[in-house]
Amino acid sequence: MLSEKDTIVACSSPPGRGAISVIRLSGDKAFSIIQKITKNKLKKQISVVKFPLNADLIEKCVLTIFKAPNSYTGEDIVEISTHGNPYIVEEVIKKCLDSGAKIAKPGEFTLRAFLNNKLSVSYTHLRAHETPINL
């Protein structure tokens, strides 16, 4: 069951396809989760932060914040741009999960956008039929 109250996280970039991956965090707790992890206040729309992956590894990330309702989902969103290495992407997502986020189910960001009147029914039908061939 999908809950609109959960803050969700997922990688929005195709795995292993680029040097940079974007991890999206959406929901009421998106900002507080990132502040908890990075120990930074989100004062600017775009900022560079040190993202601790574990005791020995710190990743430098670019954070882009979108305040509700001015985001794709209509909720508060933090987009974390990080190196595309699958290990780093996985560790960033794990940190978000450990800090209170839930893993997003396929289509959940788009569903939230639709439920928050950010997308039309016809657009969501088009998104549901996208394939790597017609993108």
Task: Pin down the residues of each PLM region.
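A glycine-rich (often HGG/GG-containing) alpha/beta subdomain
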Residues: 1-127
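Single conserved hydrophobic/aromatic residue that forms the stacking wall/gate
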Residues: 125, 132-135
